[in-house]
Structure formats: structure tokens, C-alpha cells
């Protein structure tokens, strides 16, 4: 599992040419500031020297062990920093949680957001502390666990979204490209919504239809994106995107 995760992380950075995941304040042409955006795109000026593939494929077992230990240490530090950085105020939870769903990149992302992979790896580390028997019985596949609602996640561009609703309830135009010092990067949004081809399109899974009406519905949260309002003013605003699929219930009357 560790080797698989390390391979995914290496692939993530190799394909995305990602810049460090830190809050950035990038200035493009015209001194337009972009505060609080995680720039995961191909920013050559920010990435520094590139490491060749041969530097990551050592045949020595000691080198592999050292590499694994290094990655685990870095990942654990990222998880700790992410937990410390999360605000405790209820109003800021959505904005903090879904910041990772926006990516600036020169090409289509090939992997889910890195924080999603970190969360999966954290769950793996927690499971590693269990005994083999407990871990085997806690495997969702062995317990036959199924999601109440089937969902699907994918990266979409501003060309797909075109418009969105901001926090004031107004409709704004989502700009496809963001100017940076070395050119332009596209805005990508990692959206999660109910799967129209799933088995729960007629209702939630596991709900007693004799007593309840159920429906799987896509819900939205706010993320920051570069937009233009009806007065042609360009700026960073919080907009709503699809982020989850939840089950809604209403009790049947007259029974």
C-alpha cells in the first residue's frame, strides 16, 4: 500500500508539474493579484530544478527504504499542518475544506486533488495500527458496505461551467484562463455529483420505501475562482460548485 501510494504521489507531481501546495499570492500582467489560491499548475519559475526520473528509481533496497521514509515523513507533516490550518469557525469550514478542489494547470489533471490522496493515506496509516484480523474484518469490501447514494467525481473547466452563482446570489462568468508571469493557466474544478447512471437514481439505497420517500441530490459548496461580474469587473470570488451527493428523506403520509 505504501509503495502504491508513493507511486501515485510521484505520478501526481510528475504529470502535474505541481508547485508546492502553499497559499500563493501570484501577480500576473497588469499587477492583478490572486490571493489565497493554490497554484498546482506548471509554474516553472516556482518549481525550481526538475528531478530526473532516474533519481527516483534506485535499485538499492536501502535507497528505496530511505525514499519511503522521507515521503511518509513529508506526508505526515502535511497532514499535521492541514489539521492546524483548518479554522474552527463554522462559517469558514466549507471554504477551507474545498480549496483543494480548484487547480490552476496548463493541462488536464490526471489525479484527484492531492489532499484527497493524503486523506486516503491517513486512513491507511490508521488501519496499519490494527491487528491483521481486525483490519481484515474492517475492510468495507468484506463487510459488504455500499454507499447510500452513487456519486461521480471529475475535473471540469470554466469552458464547461461558463457561469456560476457567487456568495451574494449573483450570476458571474467563470474565466477559463488565469494570467501568470509566464503566460496563462486554466482553471480546473474537481466536482462531485450524483451519478445519473448509478443504481440510486430512483432513490437512496437501503431506505424502507414503505415509510419513506428518498432522493439522491447533489449539494454544493463554495470555492474561490477568478470570475467576471455583470459590470465586467474581474476578481476572485467564492462561487458554488458541486461537491457531494447526499440522501434526502421525507416521511410518507397517510400510512
From Swiss-Prot:
Please indicate if the UniProt record lists Coiled coil as a keyword: no
Show the propeptide residue ranges. Answer: 19-136
| Sequence segments annotated as region (Disordered) | 44-67
Q: What is its main location?
A: secreted
Site for Cleavage, residues: 57-58
**Gene3D superfamilies for the chain:** Cystine-knot cytokines (2.10.90.10)
Q: How is it modified after translation?
A: Mature BDNF is produced by proteolytic removal of the propeptide, catalyzed by a FURIN family member. In addition, the precursor form is proteolytically cleaved within the propeptide, but this is not an obligatory intermediate for the production of mature BDNF. Can be converted into mature BDNF by plasmin (PLG).
UniProt KW Cytoplasm keyword: no
Disulfide bond annotation, renumbered to this chain:
149-216, 194-245, 204-247
Q: Where is the signal peptide?
A: 1-18
Query: Its domain of life?
Result: Eukaryota
From the UniProt record, which GO molecular function terms apply? Answer: growth factor activity; nerve growth factor receptor binding
Q: Where in the cell is it found?
A: Secreted
> Quick one: a GO cellular component term?
axon
Q: Name one GO biological process term.
A: modulation of chemical synaptic transmission
Entry function: Important signaling molecule that activates signaling cascades downstream of NTRK2. During development, promotes the survival and differentiation of selected neuronal populations of the peripheral and central nervous systems. Participates in axonal growth, pathfinding and in the modulation of dendritic growth and morphology. Major regulator of synaptic transmission and plasticity at adult synapses in many regions of the CNS.
The record describes its quaternary structure and partners as: Monomers and homodimers. Binds to NTRK2/TRKB. Can form heterodimers with other neurotrophin family members, such as NTF3 and NTF4 (in vitro), but the physiological relevance of this is not clear. BDNF precursor form: interacts with the heterodimer formed by NGFR and SORCS2. Mature BDNF has much lower affinity for the heterodimer formed by NGFR and SORCS2.
Task: Give the family this protein belongs to, as stated in its UniProt record.
Answer: Belongs to the NGF-beta family.
Q: What is this protein called?
A: Neurotrophic factor BDNF precursor form
Amino acid at each position: 500500500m505504501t509503495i502504491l501510494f508513493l507511486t501515485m504521489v510521484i505520478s501526481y507531481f510528475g504529470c502535474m508539474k505541481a508547485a508546492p501546495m502553499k497559499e500563493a499570492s501570484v501577480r500576473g500582467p497588469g499587477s492583478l493579484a490572486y490571493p489565497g489560491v493554490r497554484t498546482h499548475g506548471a509554474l516553472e519559475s516556482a518549481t525550481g530544478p526538475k528531478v530526473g526520473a532516474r533519481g527516483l528509481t534506485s535499485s538499492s533496497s536501502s535507497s528505496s527504504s530511505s525514499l519511503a521514509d522521507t515521503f511518509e515523513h513529508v506526508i505526515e507533516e502535511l497532514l499535521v499542518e492541514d489539521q492546524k490550518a483548518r479554522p474552527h469557525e463554522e462559517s469558514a469550514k466549507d471554504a477551507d475544506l474545498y480549496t483543494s478542489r480548484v487547480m490552476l494547470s496548463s493541462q488536464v489533471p490526471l489525479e484527484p486533488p492531492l489532499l484527497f490522496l493524503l486523506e486516503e493515506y491517513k486512513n491507511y496509516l490508521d488501519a496499519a495500527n490494527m491487528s491483521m484480523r481486525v483490519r481484515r474484518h474492517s475492510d468495507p469490501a468484506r463487510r459488504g458496505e455500499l454507499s447510500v447514494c452513487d456519486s461521480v467525481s471529475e475535473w471540469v473547466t470554466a469552458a464547461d461551467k461558463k457561469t456560476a452563482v457567487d456568495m451574494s446570489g449573483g450570476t458571474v462568468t467563470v474565466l477559463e484562463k488565469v494570467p501568470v508571469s509566464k503566460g496563462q493557466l486554466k482553471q480546473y474544478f474537481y466536482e462531485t455529483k450524483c451519478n445519473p447512471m448509478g443504481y440510486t437514481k430512483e432513490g437512496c439505497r437501503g431506505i424502507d420505501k414503505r415509510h419513506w420517500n428518498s432522493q439522491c441530490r447533489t449539494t454544493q459548496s463554495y470555492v474561490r475562482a477568478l470570475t467576471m461580474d455583470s459590470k465586467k469587473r474581474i476578481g476572485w470570488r467564492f462561487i458554488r460548485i458541486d461537491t457531494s451527493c447526499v440522501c434526502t428523506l421525507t416521511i410518507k403520509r397517510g400510512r
